[in-house]
Amino acid sequence: TISVTEDEVLGIGGENIQGFYAAMKYFQSLDNPNNKKFVEAFKAKYGPKSVIGDVTQAAYLGPWLWKMTVEKAGSFDVDKVAAASPDIEFKEAPEGYVKIHKNHHLWSKTRIGQSLPDGQFKLIAESPKLIEPDPFPKGYQ
């Protein structure tokens, strides 16, 4: 599956989906200092049983990337912000380092995880470097 995150597993029950694979850029179980800090703060705010999926982490990134882009643009003007967005880097992202491409999508790593009975994902594979975003690939039209 490519659309089941920790959020959905919470409702389905980890024991009911154990062993399924998911391709995401973020799993709550990622072992890096940024993610550990993020998960700890999230659980302190929303409770120890709360989970964080790829979509939640992406929602967290948005305001930070917007802030950095507005600061670079020196303006809230949408055209100036859009023009300033390429090459904005977020080194403290829970998923790890990300960067905005000139097409306004993120360079990020891709990961494959296997679901565990506790509702988390075991990291099985990770791209060795950031993947260039291609939101409109030729040949799919």
Identify the meaning behind each predicted range.
Residues 1-141:
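Extracytosolic ligand-binding ectodomains
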